[in-house]
Amino acid sequence: LKEAQCAIVVIGDETEQDVWIEDCSVAMANMHLMASSLGIGSCWVQGRLRNADEKTTEEFVRERLGFPENYKLEAILTLGMPDAEAPAHQLDELPMEKIKWERY
């Protein structure tokens, strides 16, 4: 995060929706995919239920950005131009034994 060229902080108003976590997660996923389609590197940095030193990550970020108490931190999406692109995994490299069909 420290060296990211850009970061998007995604917060949700817990007083407006009981599904704010899901809404924020969908927004994060869509931005993550869009960045990739544009050739921009991105990384999902989980913020909710995480700690930063002596306080929660949410408290740490809130102190710096000043968002209201009813808004809760979901995550931070960092953006930048990637140095290199990792090759995709081949199908035979994937742990297919972890896939269950119809029953666990």
Predicted regions and their residues:
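Acidic, surface-exposed loops and disordered segments
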Residues: 1-104
